[in-house]
A protein has these predicted regions:
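RNA-binding basic/glycine-rich loop and surface signature characteristic of RAMP-family CRISPR effectors
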Residues: 1-264
């Protein structure tokens, strides 16, 4: 079924003892802005959503098994070229019609796709404290016999992060992003950290606490996304919150626009 109305969403993510998104420019340390607030890039969020959607059976172009550019190029080029290439690409790959794609590959000349789903930069509610833990490597990969080598693990002690995004109904009509696709996106948001554990993100260290899902009654929406997001107010109950229960979260619904709330 065609998506006829705009959707806005906001997700609250708790982080405890994990690195939610490493910064390659800072040796993989958790991302922060100039004020010390934790940051998760939209690319990171989309990667996790792609992984969950792939597990749900959706066909994904930029998948983990083929994240190298040449592999993705071969996969994209396998679809027969033609004037309707972008339409067929949107029909085949969920992430193309959802997030868009630039087909900048050799021997493939096709217009780019503007996706229906946009996700903002994700920030923590308060500045985060990053802890560095020193570790040793006992297995040497050289002939150096001086003993063990030192390394480090960096993690956020605690942070509550806020993901904000929207589904543009006008773009959805162009890419074929349907109401059923939107429902799959909602489920993927709720399952974002399923099967996502690693040394940097131990199981249970990152959790989706709550999802606000606003369904407008028109393609343009009754209110701007910024005004919708401001209806959710988050305040810490103490100077040093350590868990989700240390926050008070209120929602002042706008007339004619009441969110669906998932989680606790």
């Amino acid at each position: 079924m065609q998506l006829a109305d705009r959707i806005d969403f906001m997700e609250l993510i708790s982080v405890s003892g994990a690195n939610p998104n490493g910064d390659p420019a800072k040796l993989g340390m958790p991302r922060t802005d100039s004020r010390g607030f934790g940051v998760i890039s939209p690319v990171c969020i989309r990667r996790k959503l792609r992984d969950r959607l792939s597990e749900m059976g959706e066909c994904i172009l930029v998948s983990p098994s083929g994240s190298r550019g040449d592999v993705i190029a071969r996969r994209a080029s396998a679809l027969a070229p033609g004037r309707d290439y972008t339409a067929r690409a949107c029909e085949k790959w969920y992430d193309v019609r959802a997030f868009g794609q630039v087909f900048a590959f050799p021997e493939l000349h096709a217009p780019g796709v503007k996706g229906a789903v946009t996700i903002q930069q994700t920030y923590s509610v308060l500045p985060v404290k990053i802890t560095e833990m020193k570790i040793t490597r006992c297995i040497r990969n050289t002939d150096d016999r001086r003993g063990t080598q030192m390394g480090s693990i960096n993690f956020v002690e605690h942070g509550l992060y806020v993901v904000k995004g929207s589904v543009n109904a006008y773009s959805a009509q162009k890419t074929g992003f349907s109401a059923e696709d939107a429902e799959k996106l909602r489920l993927a948001l709720l399952r974002m950290f399923d099967n996502d554990s690693s040394a940097a993100r131990p199981a249970g260290a990152m959790e989706v606490e709550r999802l606000y899902w606003w369904r407008h009654s028109s393609m343009s929406g009754e209110y701007s996304p910024g005004r919708v997001f401001r209806t959710v107010e988050i305040k810490a109950d103490c100077a040093d919150p350590r868990c989700f229960d240390d926050y008070t979260i209120t929602n002042s619904a706008l007339p004619g626009l009441v969110p669906e709330i998932y989680g606790r």
